[in-house]
Structures are given as C-alpha cells and as structure tokens.
Design a protein with these regions (language model features):
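Ankyrin repeat A-helix N-terminal signature
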Residues: 55-60, 91-97, 125-131, 159-167, ...
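N-terminal segments that cap or nucleate solenoid repeat domains
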Residues: 37-39, 46-91, 327, 331, ...
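Ankyrin repeat boundary signal
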Residues: 78-81, 111-115, 145-149, 181-185, ...
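Bacterial N-terminal signal peptides
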Residues: 17-28
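Acidic/polar low-complexity surface segments
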Residues: 153, 219-236, 253, 261-271, ...
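Start-of-repeat signature of ankyrin repeats
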Residues: 49, 85, 118-119, 152-153, ...
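Conserved ankyrin/ankyrin-like repeat signature
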Residues: 64, 99-100, 133-134, 169-170, ...
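Ankyrin repeat domain, specifically the short helix-to-loop turn at the C-terminus of the second helix
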Residues: 69-76, 102-110, 136-144, 172-180, ...
C-alpha cells in the first residue's frame, strides 16, 4: 500500500469519528450534563433567532418579525443588540418601518435603548430620517423627546429639523410631545432652528418658529486670543506631565504604574493618561487672565542675525472672535433663500450679526451666495455694516469673493452657480446707499485661504483698490460713478503684524533698511492695476482680467488723473510693475504719458532690472529680454540684477539712497 493510499484511508477513517464520539458522549453523560447541553443548544437557537430578528427588522419584514417575537421561550430576544448597540427597534426606526416598530414595541422593545457610541435611541434615528409616523409611535410608547446623544448633545428635534424627507411631520410630533424648540447641542450651542436653516428646511423652520423657537439665539462665542492662551497652557501641562516622573501621573488612571522605573520614554498608557488630564483641564474653566496680541507674541528675529521683533499670533489676531451664529447666518452662509425667507417671515432680525459683526448680507457676499445677497438687499438689509475685525463690508466682500486668489487645492465657488453676477450685487448695494470708500482695518485672514504667497497686505484697501487689483474695469467705473475715490492707497500695519513674505518675492523683510512706519501709505490703485503682486510667487495665484491691464491703467490716468509715476512705499512705479510682467505695450503707453523709465526703487533696482530675471530671495523672476532691450533703448539703466536681500549677498549698491523712510542724515536712529 502506497503512502498516499495510507494517508487517504487514514483521513477517511476519521471522517465518521465526530458522529461516533457524539453518540458515545451522549450515552456516558449524566442527566444534568445532558440537560446543560440541551440548554446550550436552546441558547444558540435563541441567539440565531435574535440575529434573524435584527435582519428582518432592518428589512421591514413585519410578518417575520411577528413570528420571531411570538415563539415564546424559543423566540428571539426583542432587545438583543449588535456590538454597536443597535437593536431591532433601532433598525426599524432608522428605516422608517412603522409596522415593524409597532410589533416590536408591543413585544416589549425598549424605546430608550442607546447605541454604544453616542447613546442614540431609536427616536434619534427615526427623527434623523424624517420618519414622522415612527417618531409619533415611539413618543406614544414613552420615548423621551428631549433625550440628547452623549457625543454631540443633539436631540431628536435637531435631527428631525434637518431631515430631508418629511421632516416637518417628525418635527410636529416631537413638538406636540414636549420637545424643547430651543434646545442646544453640545459643541457650539446650535438649536434645531439652526439645523433647519443650514439644511434649507423652510417647513421645519416655520413649525419651530410657531412653537416658540427663538431666531435670535446665537451659537457660543469664542474669543480667539484667550482660547489660544488656554490651548497653549493645556499643551504645556501635557508636555510637562509626559516628561515628568511617571508616579506623578498616578491620580490620572489606574493603568499608570507608579512603581515602575522611569524608562526614559513615556509608555502609551502614560501618554493616554496625560491626554485625559489635558482634556479635563480644558473643561475646567481655567481663567487665563488678561491676554493681548503682544502678550501672546513670539519675540525673536525673522531671519538669522535680524532684529528682535514681537510677532503676535498673526491669524488669531486677524480672526479675533468666532461664533455668535444665528439661524439666519447659517442660511446665509449656505445660500438658502427659502430657509432665509421663512426665518425673516418668522421674525428674524435681518441685520443681527455674528461675534465678529458679520451680518447675514456680509456672510452671503463672502460665500458667493449672490442670489441670497440680492434677496436680503431687497428686504432692507443694511449695506454698510462691516465686520468688527477687518472692517470688510458687503461691497468689498463681493469683489473679494469674485476675484479670490487661486489656491493649491479646490475652494468653494458658489458664485459660479448663481443667477446673479457680482456686478448685479455691486449695483444693488450701491443703489441701496452703500458707502463706496470704506477701508479695511486689517489684512484679511482668508485672503489666500490661509496661504501667504503674494506678500500683499490689504490693510486700508477700498473696494475700488480691490477692483483695480483684479483689473475689473467695469466695477471700477461703477464705483466711481457712485462716488468712489480712486486715489486711496493701502497702508502699513504695525511691524509685527506684517506678512513675512514681501510683495517683491523675498521670504522676509531683511533689507536692513528702516522699517516703513505704521500707517504709512503702501500701494495705490494704479500699482494694483499695473501688476502689483506679480513680483513673487503671487503671480501664480492672482485671479484677474489679464486682458485688462492696459484699459485699467489708461482709465486711471486719462479719466481719473492718476500719476503715471506714482511711487509706492518701496518706490516702485507702475513702470516697474509693467516691466516685471514683460508688458511692453503697457510700458510704451506709460512712456507716452510721460512715465519715467529711469526710476530706481528703494532697493536700488531700475525698471530694466525688473525684467532681467534676477532673484528675489528664493524666487527667480521670469526674464523678458525684449523688455530689457526696450527699456534700455528708452534710457533705463542696469543697476542691480538681484533684489536687495542682505543675508544672501544679493545687495544692491543703490539700496536706501534717497530713502523717504530714512532718519535724518545726522542720525542713525531707526536703522537696523
């Protein structure tokens, strides 16, 4: 007999063994053990029935459910749950199977059973799906209409208010059974009315308002600087705890072994305990005291060897405050005209602003919701109310949104989906009496979606300046027709609140020239129109009308009297900006209007230098040889190839000569 045959026979000889062993064990087992095995088999059968019950409830198979719960001692456990805590009643509620839910409730299903995470009851799931009949059934069976989930703190009414299908019937059932129309969820204090507004559920919003929902309730307000101070303190404490002897963490969890020797690296349990302690600290209401931009600033040089500066937390200072969002602000952000109309008809204040004084009209403009912006203007929204931080008004916001810089990643473009164009909104705002000349208080934190490529600072910019930066000549003319001043420049903020990247492409201001004073004029509209912002990486981010450089500059010079040789704060002229883009046609036009091709910048570069392709910090400009030839033929000199950038050796001999920001010749005060 071969080995293979022996193996096959051996394998075959064992094939009947389980049956023989089972018979033998059955014969030898005492009566009690046999009964125990029978009970185990019965338990397995019940477990199987419970699994089938969960599936049948999910699928809406009411007859199967009825049969399974009617099997007496052998029937399914009506409250059996999966590992996530979902019972048959949860599934029936989630899918809207009212008949199944009735059978389960009659069989003793617990109406307030909660899931493992969040303790979502069947009522929450039915409300989220907008299943009004199931919601009513659960409430009649004793479900708590105000029970909140433990993770987000939402009630069933929050979820019903946002439901896409038949949400109003679910909302009505909940309100009829005592649900609080002004309940707040746990993260930001949002109400059911805010959920309805954000999801554009006008019928649900109307029902909530009729039941006493307050349209003026705001979300929680966060003062960003104190919040930053608290976060820093929490992080400091956590780092100290992780770096401390392990036994000091004993009170934060029994898993911490206070007897073990300190190994030099924290264990996962050690880190987890520190994180838990940090969370407890953040919830403790710790008072950080008085804080300011300067007290939270970092002191040090921007570059090796540079002067010490106090750098306040830049974006946090610009943001200032968050929250204070009403239901109408939620609708405005999403552009939901129907929900906004329901809210206004129900008594919402059309001008109630958020924590940073953003009104619904400004919110709509900032988010490209131009159709809703027009509707708000028609209903009497104030066109001049500005944000309290940056001072942006709806007029500026419309232009900023329309011509928002390009980004490395996709950004919302709701304005592309509107029936109204940006000119329609600008015209409506101006016709409603909007001031055409408000200036920004600060730079906009959302200017480049959090990036800083251009080095442009918008402090002091007007709507006209913003239109000029985009070469939006139609908007420029409309603004002037309504009284816009075309000669208002941007201005410099305090030194510590300036972008590190400079508008000529340098990574930081390291020219060693005196600081330009706070409040000093920076760039005029003619610089913006001629190509200001194109000297560095910003050239790849600008969104504008590239075919309108010359018409925009001509309009400024010929119709508005702009100075063809206007110097900005770094002594660039419109000619410099045209040269940096290789725009020979604009150069020739500027020369025809008396433009000076021999002008030298504060950093010591000529107009021709701007077209030579030299370095500006880590950025190398595109060379335009034909532009260099044109300018030199017109009298421009070649002074310095690379932009003055002291620490790299790219220093221009003419930098700082005739510097308007230099102290008196006999004093070196202010030199760096």
């Amino acid at each position: 007999m071969s080995g293979m045959t022996r193996r096959l026979r051996r394998r075959g000889s064992w094939s009947a063994a389980p049956f023989a062993v089972a018979l033998l064990i059955s014969a030898l087992l005492p009566a009690g053990a046999a009964a125990q095995e029978e009970a185990s088999s019965s338990s397995s059968s019940a477990s199987s029935s419970s699994d089938r019950l969960l599936e049948a409830a999910r699928d809406g198979a009411v007859e199967v459910v009825r049969a399974l719960v009617a099997d007496g001692a052998d029937g399914a456990d009506v409250n059996a749950a999966r590992g996530d805590g979902m019972t048959a009643l949860h599934f029936a509620a989630e899918r809207g199977h009212a008949a199944v839910a009735r059978v389960l409730i009659d069989a003793g299903a617990a109406v307030d059973a909660g899931t493992r995470i969040g303790r979502y009851a069947p009522l929450h799931l039915a409300a989220r799906g907008g299943h009004g009949p199931v919601v009513a059934l659960l409430l009649e069976a004793g479900a708590d209409p105000n029970a909140a989930t433990t993770n987000s703190g939402v009630t069933a009414l929050h979820l019903a208010a946002a439901a896409a299908v038949d949400g109003r019937s679910a909302v009505a059932a909940l309100l009829d059974h005592g649900a609080d129309p002004n309940a707040r969820e746990g993260s930001a204090g949002q109400t059911p009315l805010m959920f309805a507004a954000a999801a554009n559920r006008p019928a649900a919003a109307a029902a909530l308002l009729e039941a006493g929902a307050d349209p003026g309730t705001p979300t929680a307000v966060v003062d960003v600087l104190p919040s930053l101070a608290l976060d820093r303190e929490a992080n400091r404490r956590m780092r100290d705890m992780i770096g401390a002897p392990r036994e000091t963490l004993g009170p934060y969890g029994p898993e911490v072994d206070s007897e073990a020797e300190w190994p030099g690296e924290p264990t996962p349990a050690h880190v987890q305990a520190a994180i838990r302690a940090q969370r407890e600290f953040l919830r403790s209401g710790f008072d950080v005291g008085e804080v300011s931009a300067h007290s939270l600033g970092r002191t040090g040089p921007d570059y090796p060897g540079g002067p010490d500066l106090i750098r306040p937390p830049y974006r946090e200072v610009l943001v200032g405050r968050t929250g204070g969002m009403t239901a109408l602000l939620h609708a405005a952000r999403e552009g939901h005209i129907e929900a906004a109309t329901a809210l206004l008809d129900g008594g919402a204040n059309i001008d109630q602003a958020s924590a940073d004084a953003t009104t619904p009209l400004l919110m709509a403009a900032l988010n490209g919701q131009f159709d809703l912006a027009l509707a708000l203007i028609e209903r009497g929204a104030d066109p001049d109310l500005a944000a309290s931080t940056d001072g942006a008004t709806p007029l500026f916001a419309v232009l900023q949104t329309q011509w928002a810089p390009k980004s490395n990643y996709p950004q919302p473009r709701a304005q592309d989906l509107q029936d109204a164009g940006h000119m329609d909104v600008l015209r409506a705002l101006l016709d409603a009496g909007a001031d055409p000349n408000p200036r920004l208080n600060t730079h906009l934190w959302y200017w480049e979606y959090g990036l800083t490529k251009m080095g442009i600072d918008l402090t002091g910019a007007t709507p006209f300046w913003r239109a000029a930066f985009a070469q939006d000549i139609e908007a420029m003319k409309l603004l002037v027709a309504h009284g816009a001043d075309p000669n208002i420049p941007t201005r410099w903020p305090e030194v510590g609140m300036r972008e590190r990247r400079q508008q000529d492409g340098r990574q930081q201001e390291d020219s060693a020239l005196p600081w330009i004073p706070e409040g000093a004029p920076n760039a005029w509209p003619i610089h913006a129109a001629a190509g200001g912002g194109y000297l560095g990486l910003g050239a790849f981010s600008v969104r504008n009308r590239p075919d309108q450089f010359i018409p925009a500059v001509k309009y400024l010079i010929e119709e508005l009297g702009a100075d063809v040789d206007q110097r900005d704060s770094w002594l660039y002229t419109p000619m410099h900006y045209a040269a940096s883009r290789g725009d020979n046609e604009l150069i020739e036009y500027l020369v025809s209007q008396g433009g000076d091709v021999t002008a030298i910048t504060r950093l010591g570069q000529s107009t021709a230098d701007m077209a030579r392709g030299g370095r500006a910090g880590f950025f190398t400009r595109v060379p335009f040889p034909e532009t260099v030839d044109l300018l030199t033929s017109l009298g421009a000199t070649l002074e310095c190839l690379h932009t003055h950038f002291l620490d790299t050796g790219d220093s221009c001999p003419g930098a700082g000569i005739d510097d308007p920001w230099a102290p008196a010749a006999t004093s070196q005060e202010g030199k760096r």
